[in-house]
Amino acid sequence: QLFIDNSLKKSELIQVAQLNLAQCDVAKHEMDNRKSTEVNNLGKVVNTSMAEYAPAISLDGGSLYFTSRRPWADDSSEPFRDPRLNNYPEDIYVTNVDSDMSWTSPEKLEFCKSELNEATISVSADERRIYIYNDASGGGDIYYSDFAKNQFEDIKEFTNKGVNSKSWETHCSVTPDGRDLYFVSDRPGGYGGRDIYRIVKLP
């Protein structure tokens, strides 16, 4: 608060400071209203020493799609590893619940490319379409892949007018009936930073 009170009103860091204050308020509230919860690691079958995140679970709970920065088994992703962060590009994997209710060994989705970032966003209610973040354009946009002939097809850019732009679009979620799509963008005209937008499919 001291920084906000004494900084130039045009400072770009004011919004960051205000967000940090709001986060502190949330943290205090949660600490004062603790709930008994148990968090379980999915174990070595799913997790590795590299980063795994952005899980999206199917409606029936039988499939888990997630983003991982693990290296490819054939080492073809090695030339694209970030030497500073020791990160490999993002890829999407899926694991399924087997007959004894444990997770199967994750499989990389067919459309992933070793040199690009493809990250999980969400999965449609019928699990026939997966929405993907892809940075092939340089700015980061929303793509999708449809399930056909027993596999996910090559990704396609989401072409509905008003979604992808020259700005950064990172996430989207579609209602079960497919009518409404909510997405995140840092385009000009919002409240600042990344904002949530909605488009509606017309009859």
Residue ranges and their predicted role:
Residues 2-203:
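Short, conserved micro-motifs composed of acidic
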